[in-house]
Swiss-Prot record:
It comes from Wolbachia pipientis wMel. PANTHER family: RECOMBINATION PROTEIN RECR (PTHR30446:SF0). A zinc finger (C4-type) spans 55-70. Belongs to the RecR family. SUPFAM superfamilies: Recombination protein RecR. Gene3D superfamilies: 3.40.1360.10, 6.10.250.240, RecR Domain 1 (1.10.8.420). PROSITE patterns: RECR, TOPRIM. GO terms for biological process: DNA recombination; DNA repair. InterPro entries: DNA_Rcmb_RecR, Rcmb_RecR, Rcmb_RecR_Znf, TOPRIM_dom, TOPRIM_RecR. This is Recombination protein RecR. Residues 78-173 form the Toprim domain. It comes from the Bacteria. May play a role in DNA repair. It seems to be involved in an RecBC-independent recombinational process of DNA repair. It may act with RecF and RecO. Keywords: DNA damage, DNA recombination, DNA repair, Metal-binding, Zinc, Zinc-finger.
Amino acid sequence: MNVNIKNLVHAFSKLPSLGPSSSRRLVIHLLQNKEKVMLPLASLIKELADLIIECEVCGNLDTKSPCSICTNPKRDTKLLCVVEELGDLWAFEKGNIYSGLYHVLGGRLSAINGIGPKELNLDTILKRVTESKIEEIIIAINPTLEGQVTAQYIIELLKNLDVKISRLACGIPMGGEIDYLDEGTLRIALTSRQEYELNIK
């Protein structure tokens, strides 16, 4: 195999859900469809790399910061949905089931992987709540063990503030990923969300 082709296969194999075999098939398809697929795709990737930036407010990706969601006057600024990854935000937006604002953490707390609060967009939640008119925080974090630890950290961070903290309702299986849920399940989980019972001493 040509070394340049081999390097491209290796680069694709680093992407989520793409192993060596699927990466090879993808590269072959691109090379065999250079004019129709490969060159337009390369142009789009280059354009996105030049234009897309991270929103300084919520962590979304857009061509401007603050992003189009944060600056949309039609969004409900009293609601803040906290999600792990950008894909979770897109899942809510795709279903058109939520009209509030978002806060993308960029992952979840993981002692094994060395990911602590400083590695995530966590402490900025406190600043957003204290400096805005947010009335409810919806914790939409994947129901994994690490997700539960992250959710508890957020609750401890905000429990003394005058803000409602809720979570998605049952329906999302333990270990499930919000990004992979169908629109109906996600809608029910959101509309039937439950408020956390805080024991403040």
